[in-house]
């Protein structure tokens, strides 16, 4: 049943126990729980029997109940600060009554930062730990401490999760909330980085609107609603004198213009909604100007369609 090493160990234990015992049998002083033969051992022992064999060479003397009696009143209940412990660690009477009364008799002269938020100073003259929960002048924990208990607390973990969630919804660019006295907010649509210093949240500016005829306009939204008029604006007389090829070219220019305008307004409205810095009235104002641009574009396209 047992391997060779286990059987050799058991035989050695039996040999020593047999030599210590008397010739007539086991002595009363030997703390054996079972009787085992000295030679010819072939019994099927249980784990409890192996434990009893081990007690032959390693007897255990239990302690008396009064030896375990411990009272908090017999020991000092004051926890020294780190600095005071380093200064007095060579003193054999560190926790004596005289040292405690000399160091902590006047708690007003003690600097709270000296304790690092990790120990309590008791007002009780008995200096017992039983009053620590009601007599502490400073809390046991300090804000920002990196102890394992603080870092693993549910409150700390939940705070980290809340911060991470808020960062996902806060805008990453530097946007300033303008007052109601300003013009409606503007957002860039092309070629402007979100980290630009001169960025305003809402501004409709496209490359095809930088023509000199619209550069003097005070409102970029107004210029966006007014398409370039170099080739697209034509009088009815000019349209009648055009041939079919010129009319088709004019229609192509109008189509390209309205597509660029619609893309610019669509990007502006989408970014106004996603950023969260624009009110509903500001978004509605940009959308109305988008509809006005469509209406003006249709008025320009209508004469060309009649002539085709």
Curated annotation (Swiss-Prot):
Protein's name according to its UniProt entry: Uncharacterized protein P4H10.14c
Keyword Disulfide bond: no
Subcellular location: Cytoplasm
Keyword line: Cytoplasm
Higher taxonomy: Eukaryota, Fungi, Dikarya, Ascomycota, Taphrinomycotina
Gene Ontology CC terms: cell division site; cell tip; cytosol
Principal subcellular localization: cytoplasm
Region of interest called Disordered, as start-end residue ranges on this chain: 138-157, 205-235
Biased composition range(s): Polar residues: 138-148, 205-229
Gene source species: Schizosaccharomyces pombe (strain 972 / ATCC 24843) (Fission yeast)
């Amino acid at each position: 049943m047992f391997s060779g090493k286990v059987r050799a160990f058991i035989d050695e234990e039996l040999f020593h126990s047999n030599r210590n015992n008397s010739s007539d049998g086991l002595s009363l002083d030997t703390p054996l729980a079972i009787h085992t033969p000295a030679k010819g051992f072939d019994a099927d022992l249980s784990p409890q029997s192996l434990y009893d064999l081990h007690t032959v060479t390693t007897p255990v003397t239990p302690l008396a109940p009064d030896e375990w009696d411990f009272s908090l009143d017999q020991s000092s209940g004051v926890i020294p600060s780190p600095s005071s412990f380093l200064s007095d660690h060579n003193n054999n009477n560190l926790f004596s009554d005289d040292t405690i009364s000399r160091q902590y008799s006047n708690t007003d002269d003690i600097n709270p930062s000296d304790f690092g938020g990790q120990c309590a100073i008791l007002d009780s003259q008995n200096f017992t730990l039983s009053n620590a929960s009601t007599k502490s002048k400073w809390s046991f924990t300090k804000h920002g401490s990196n102890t394992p208990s603080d870092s693993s607390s549910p409150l700390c973990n939940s705070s980290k999760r809340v911060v991470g969630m808020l960062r996902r919804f806060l805008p990453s660019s530097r946007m300033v909330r303008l007052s109601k006295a300003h013009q409606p907010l503007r957002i860039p649509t092309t070629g402007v980085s979100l980290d630009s210093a001169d960025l305003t949240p809402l501004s409709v500016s496209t490359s095809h609107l930088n023509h000199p005829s619209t550069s003097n306009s005070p409102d970029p939204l107004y210029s966006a609603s007014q398409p370039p008029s170099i080739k697209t604006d034509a009088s009815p007389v000019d349209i009648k004198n055009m041939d079919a090829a010129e009319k088709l070219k004019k229609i192509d220019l109008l189509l390209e213009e309205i597509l660029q305008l619609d893309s610019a307004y669509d990007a502006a409205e989408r970014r106004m909604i996603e950023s969260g810095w624009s009110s509903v009235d500001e978004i509605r104002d940009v959308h109305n100007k988008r509809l006005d641009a469509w209406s003006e574009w249709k008025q320009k396209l209508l004469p060309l369609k009649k002539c085709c």
